[in-house]
Amino acid sequence: MDEHRSATTHSPEISDSEGMIEAMGTPVDEGLAPRILTRPEHKLSRKDLSQEAIKVLYRLHRSGYSAYLVGGSVRDLLLGGRPKDFDIATNARPQEIRRLFRNSRVIGRRFRLVHVFFKGEIIEVATFRASPEPPETPDDWEEAEEEAAEEEAVADPPRPHIVEDVYGTPAEDARRRDFTINALFYNIADFSIIDHVGGIEDLERGIIRTIGDPDERFVEDPVRMMRALEYAARLGFEIDPQTAEAIDRQKALISEASTPRLTYELLECLRSGQATAIHKAWWKAGVFTRAYQDLPLDTDESVRVLEMVDAGVVAGRKFSDPSLIGGFFLPRFLVLAEEETDEKGRVNNVRLLDRLREMLEPAAASMHLSNQTVHLIHQGLFAVTKMRCAPERGHQVLKLARQGYFPVAWEFFVFAAAVGYITPEVHQSWKRALRKVGKQELTDQQRESAQERPRPHRRRRPRRRPR
Ligand code: ATP
Ligand code: MG
């Protein structure tokens, strides 16, 4: 793999003609030729792409730019799966992309990229980039968004954070990526797959391998270790021995990684439908406790909650961030609730609320959780203790069901029923009571997730991701 990292003569200016030569499969800046699979040699078909992704690829191509589908979508399509989202790389510069798509916005701080908005889907379009530097965090993005808006308002804007040499060639863009299987390009010009890093072979053999020296790549960005284990669990792949050994050597660095990005990876894991397997892999490799020091997750009940989340996601349910993160705290909270309940079943609310706050505070701070998320977890968990007995009166149900935190509380209630804190009879009586007061949507959601149905074509959530 090292040879693939050999330096290239970097040319920050990528002309359109270079793009077209690249599109024809001839590397212009490399001593090493990429491997190219022509259209009949692979099974990725245009009809597997979303209409929006096709639209963006073609508009770039017809405007004279090179345009590739890149990253996870190419990997997933070659494996016969459905991608979560479609990312595009091009030689067009952010302002040029912006001009081509009215429904777009420039984002990113040091490295600017463009989000093209469609109904329910965002296509991310990035100019080929040279630098392998760690992805940015949402905090950077927020500032950058303001800057970008100001720049657009000025004819010749000063761009203090943008350094031209962040842009690179397609080969450099492939090599700055994390794993070989994530660096394949699908070329809209001739429908070929371009592989600069040995990704096709690794995809065929089921191997997760860093691009370049694994120690260097993990030091550069420790979150990649979490990602390697996550992909292995999700795809049922093996981690290449050198990559695995480097994880073992470098895992201590994870506790210094950017917390918003770690929280983002956790939420991605929880929404993948394979949280149980990913968590197990993280736990076994000794990275979970380093990444999420303040999350209690050490009991069978916690694993049961993860299994329920997986079952829900596979059935097409959407969980909110507070219900996913709060799920980690539920088993320990239930122990606290037991401890604060006397033999007559009365709960010492003041003490329980205090202990709940003490339990959540460290994680709230170390994981950069928003006040709103913490509030919903706090209220939602506490509400479960109020639902331990069957509801007595309709207005009690309605009052609770009208609270903003109730959808989160209901998720926790269902988890609590699965781990035996709520009896099946009480569970059923709350379901009936909710239907009676016209709040059946929550219980219907559950019924739906009980039936296995094919996973819908998942569109990207319109929210920013740290990169
Ligand atoms: P998923 O199915 O989880 O979305 P993905 O491969 O699309 O998987 P993303 O997090 O969406 O993962 O990132 C898109 C692409 O960006 C990756 O495929 C990879 O090429 C590149 N990438 C993401 N994170 C990193 C990183 N930390 N270091 C280097 N490259 C990265
Ligand atoms: Mg993706």
Regions found by a protein language model. Give the residues of each.
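Catalytic cores of the polymerase beta-like nucleotidyltransferase superfamily
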Residues: 1-467
